[in-house]
Curated annotation (Swiss-Prot):
Its cofactor is Zn(2+). GO terms for biological process: cysteinyl-tRNA aminoacylation. It comes from the Bacteria. This is Cysteine--tRNA ligase. Keywords: Aminoacyl-tRNA synthetase, ATP-binding, Cytoplasm, Ligase, Metal-binding, Nucleotide-binding, Protein biosynthesis, Zinc. Its EC number is 6.1.1.16. It is an enzyme of class 6 (ligase). Its main location: cytoplasm. It comes from Dinoroseobacter shibae (strain DSM 16493 / NCIMB 14021 / DFL 12). GO terms for cellular component: cytosol. ATP binds at K275. Belongs to the class-I aminoacyl-tRNA synthetase family. It is found in: Cytoplasm. One of its GO terms (molecular function) is zinc ion binding.
Length: 458
């Protein structure tokens, strides 16, 4: 396999395939972004990092000027309406603030700005036009002020998730409404009562359903056919299934998305993240606790996008130690002209980021620091923008220093330095520089500092 032969697992075909762009001069990717009503939690960040990594690889293979990446912002949604009602704030105030938070937090994780970040509310005319086309083609109908997609009118519905419509009805929680012809039919447009966001349309004042937003924005910015559509696997059904139905029925001459990619979900310490378990936290929570964005990114990249990812404190501490060691090693080094072939080979093999990280470790062991720096920077690591945190680790060693001083004081009296030596050895093994003088004890985290190993200090 050559370095430029990119292979990706296509959810639609359930196979790993050689990626052949529709137009190598204009490689196009659409990724479903956040619904902006609150801070992004750690799970929201995973697709942002995964598809940022793919964006970087596509830019490396085809050239930065030949790749277009669209990641939308959903700023019209019932969750946003509910938050506005709870807080008494305007919807625009909430969506502007939370969009800003999201972009700041994702930038802190080293994600490059997408080519386009469209807000759904800026594309209402395109949504209305697409809905009109679907009605005219016999794929949608008006009922009680709603416009609904007629799922039975699209024979290929269910192909992405591999389920028949009847199976879906049996196994899914579908919204039952008297105006639906079929339980699986979904809303394209719904009426808005006073006090809710609404736009004039042929069907009265209302707002779009969730699924039509992405179909309209991707069509407007990328065309009837484009290369890659990505998102979390929780979006595979119904969101992506519905997008395919809408887009292929509105524009049957196009192919919509050629390759579909889905990242797996995130857990915390082996359990699903939830507020009830007390293990729910946002990206900003971690950043405010002093966990560098680069460390969060490194932990994310340590698991293949197709596997469930487990965020643990141990992984966080290990990532911090590795990055601190690498940053100390490459200080003053100029990066090689390109990433190491071994790292690139892993990345073009279905975005094998854990394999690429293993190759970074090998480059470090081999002393190939220019190669390490260039390769890590391709992966969004070891850049100047992501640095600064490593010079003064966010750790308080004052209690350990006081304890060692106490043990040392006792040892001077008994002439038995066994415990002093044991503590000192454990601290050094954890990457801590131990400085003892008449003035007292000073503990300084070194480049290989690993907080996880402090547990061994007795």
């Amino acid at each position: 396999m050559t370095a430029t032969e990119l292979k990706l697992t296509n959810t639609k075909t359930r196979r790993k395939e050689v990626f052949t762009p529709i137009d190598p001069d204009n490689v196009r990717m659409y990724v479903c972004g956040p619904t902006v009503y609150d801070r992004a939690h750690l799970g929201n960040a995973r697709p942002a990092v995964v598809f940022d990594m793919l964006f970087r690889v596509l830019r490396e293979v085809y050239g930065p000027e030949h790749v277009t990446y669209v990641r939308n912002i959903t700023d019209v949604d019932d969750k946003i309406n509910a938050r506005a009602a709870e807080t008494g704030r305007s919807i625009r105030e909430i969506t502007d603030e939370t969009t800003g938070w999201y972009l700041e937090d994702m930038a802190a994780l080293g994600t490059l700005p997408p080519t386009h970040v469209p807000r759904a509310t800026e594309y209402i005319p395109q949504m209305v036009a697409m809905i009109e086309t679907l009605i005219a083609r016999g794929h949608a109908y008006v009922a009680e002020g709603h416009v609904l997609f007629d799922v039975r009118s699209y024979g290929a519905y269910g192909a992405l998730s591999g389920r028949s419509v009847d199976d879906m009805i049996a196994g899914a929680r579908v919204e039952v409404a008297p105006y639906k012809r079929d339980p699986m039919d979904f809303v394209l447009w719904k009426p808005s009562e006073a006090g809710l966001p609404g736009w004039d349309s042929p069907w009265g004042r209302g707002r779009p359903g969730w699924h039509i937003e992405c179909s309209a924005m991707s069509h407007e910015l990328l065309g009837e056919s484009f290369d890659i559509h990505g998102g979390g696997n929780d979006l595979q059904f119904p969101h992506h299934e519905n997008e395919i139905a809408q887009s292929c029925c509105a524009h049957p001459e196009g192919g919509f998305a050629k390759v579909w990619m889905h990242n797996e979900m995130l857990q915390v310490e082996g359990k699903k993240m939830s507020k009830s378990l007390g293990n729910f936290f946002t990206v900003r929570d971690l950043l405010d606790q002093g966990v560098p964005g680069e460390v969060i990114r490194f932990v994310f990249l340590g698991t293949h996008y197709s596997k469930p990812m487990d965020w643990t404190e141990r992984k966080r501490d290990e990532a911090m130690a590795v990055l601190r060691k690498w940053r100390a090693a490459v200080a003053g080094t100029r990066p090689a002209p390109a990433a190491a072939p071994s790292v690139m080979a892993a990345l073009v093999d279905d975005l094998n980021t854990p394999g690429a990280i293993a190759e970074l470790h090998q480059l470090y062991r081999d002393g190939n620091l220019p190669g390490l720096l260039a390769s890590a920077q391709l992966m969004g690591l070891l850049s100047d923008e992501m640095g600064g945190w490593d010079s003064s680790p966010q750790v308080d060693l004052s209690e350990l220093a006081a304890r060692l001083a106490e043990v040392r004081e006792a040892a001077i009296g008994t002439k038995d330095f066994t415990q002093v030596d044991r503590m000192k050895a454990a601290l050094i093994a954890a990457g801590v520089e131990v400085r003892m003088s008449k003035a007292g004890v000073e503990l300084v985290p070194g480049p290989e500092f690993d907080a996880a190993k402090l547990e061994a200090v007795e």
